[in-house]
Design a protein with these regions (language model features):
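ATP-dependent carboxylate-amine ligase
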Residues: 1-159
């Protein structure tokens, strides 16, 4: 949980499969008095079925989703994001109304935080404790927790 004095919850979680995303959303739904917003993606060069599972869990369990990049490896990051979005549409969600697709994970986190209002909960899922993002063969420093804190600070919230 990230607390920088904002009037909504922010949770960073490692959930990166459909089942894990479903479970974290189910648990948070019980305590959420507003909207449940999720930032989530799917890793490249992994079982493509995970993309469907993540999209379906987000479509069914969250009120709003921002689909984004998560360890794309050698795959085109935006292609992965669009595929997740297409699965969400197949589950009845509307692009632009129920979900957004943003390749840049920082921008996706920022957008989710900007969308949040009092009593909402923003879940940043998929990376959790991990300290890097994988592009091709390169591991670049990355920390969802720190990015969420940085973006909350830019929105005027300080711990």
């Amino acid at each position: 949980r990230i607390d920088s004095g904002q009037p909504f919850g922010v949770v960073v979680d490692y959930a990166h499969t459909g089942e894990a995303v479903r479970k974290v959303l189910e648990v948070l739904r019980v305590v959420c008095r507003g909207r449940l917003i999720i930032v989530v993606g799917a890793a490249g060069e992994r079982d493509p079925g995970r993309r469907f599972g993540v999209a379906r869990a987000a479509a069914e369990g969250a009120d709003y989703a921002v689909f984004t990049n998560e360890d794309p490896r050698s795959e085109d990051p935006m292609e992965i994001v669009r595929e997740i979005g297409a699965f969400a549409e197949g589950a009845g969600r509307r692009r632009g109304e129920d979900f957004l697709e943003l390749e840049d994970r920082r921008m996706a986190i920022r957008e989710a935080l900007k969308q949040a209002g009092p009593d909402d909960i923003v879940v940043v899922a998929g990376k959790g404790h991990e300290q890097s993002m994988i592009y091709g063969e390169e591991q670049r420093p990355w920390d969802d927790r720190q990015v969420a804190r940085d973006e909350l600070s830019k929105l005027g919230f300080e711990a």
